[in-house]
C-alpha cells in the first residue's frame, strides 16, 4: 500500500543508494529496502483501514456503472457503490525490440529490485534515483 513511490520508486531506490554507501552486502541492502517498504506499506494500510473503509485486494471488472465484481482466488463478490475508486497502478512499457520481453538478463526498475544476487556486470539506461 502506498503506490509507486513507496513500493518501487523513490523510497526503495533512495534506500538502496544510501545502504550501498554503508558498504553493506547486496543481501543486507535488499533486506533494508524490504524492511523500510514493508513498514511504510503497513502504516498506509493501517491508516486507510482505520477510517472504516472496506479494502479489497482483488481483480475486478464492471458489471454496470455502479456495480463491480471482484475476484480473489476462487472467491467472487459483487459490490455496489455510488462512487468507485479505480486504483490500478501501472506497468512499464516494453519496447517492441526482438528478444527484449523474453530475456532473463534485462530488467526494468521494478524487476531489478527483486533480484536475490547482485549481477556481476550491469548496464543502466535511464537516470535519476530510479535509474541509478
Predicted features and spans:
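Residues forming the Rossmann-fold NAD(P)(H) cofactor-binding site
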Residues: 132
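Beta1-alpha1 glycine-rich phosphate/pyrophosphate-binding loop at the start
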Residues: 1-40
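FAD-binding core/adjacent interface of flavoenzyme oxidoreductases
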Residues: 3-8, 18, 40-125, 129
Amino acid at each position: 500500500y502506498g503506490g509507486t513511490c513507496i513500493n518501487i520508486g523513490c523510497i526503495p531506490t533512495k534506500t538502496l543508494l544510501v545502504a550501498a554507501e554503508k558498504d553493506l552486502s547486496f543481501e543486507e541492502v535488499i533486506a533494508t529496502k524490504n524492511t523500510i517498504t514493508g513498514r511504510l506499506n503497513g502504516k498506509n494500510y493501517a491508516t486507510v483501514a482505520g477510517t472504516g473503509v472496506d479494502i479489497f485486494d482483488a481483480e475486478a471488472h464492471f458489471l454496470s456503472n455502479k456495480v463491480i465484481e471482484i475476484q480473489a482466488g476462487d472467491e467472487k463478490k459483487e459490490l455496489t457503490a455510488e462512487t468507485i475508486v479505480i486504483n490500478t497502478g501501472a506497468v512499464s512499457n516494453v519496447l517492441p525490440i526482438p528478444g527484449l520481453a523474453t530475456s532473463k538478463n534485462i530488467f526494468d526498475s521494478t524487476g531489478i529490485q527483486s533480484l536475490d544476487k547482485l549481477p556481476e556486470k550491469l548496464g543502466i539506461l535511464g537516470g535519476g534515483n530510479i535509474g541509478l
